[in-house]
Amino acid sequence: MWKNTCKLLLFDLDGTLLQSDKTISKRTLSVLKQCREKGILIGVSTSRSEQNSLVYLNELMPDILISSGGALVKYGTEYIYKAEFSVTETNAMIDMARIVCGNDCEITIDTTDAHYWNYKVDPKKLDQSWGDSIYTDFSDFTECSLTLNLDIGP
């Protein structure tokens, strides 16, 4: 019955569309193309930022993108939903993270246009799929954020 009513297929990247080697199989791309030919929209929903998904988005060309854990929704090239923390809120969270977790806690922040990090080890050396990230110590961060993540590790 869903064949006649399905209008959108929505997929995660990591662990779903991406194989263990962080690639999308030719078979998957072929099936998604067939779905498109039947008028079904293809969407990606990921906790990754848009910037850290570009290598896959350029290959998939999704009609709909839900990124940064739902903080950003894009239909085609238009952002239709954006839930950002203000610069003041973002800096308050950075300050609180350092108070609670210590000054050397590892932080990543997603904005609409970039992915920022202060990791001791460049994440691109661990996983090439993370795309272009910008290193900062967050001491003078002046952007609204979509997400702020802490790696407090052992």
Name what the model sees in each region:
Residues 77-80, 150-154:
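Short, solvent-exposed beta-strand edge segments and adjacent coil->beta transition regions
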Residues 23-127:
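Active-site phosphate-binding/coordination module
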Residues 2-21, 93:
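Asp-based phosphoryl-transfer active-site loop
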Residues 123-148:
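Acidic, His- and aromatic-enriched active-site or binding-groove loops in soluble protein domains
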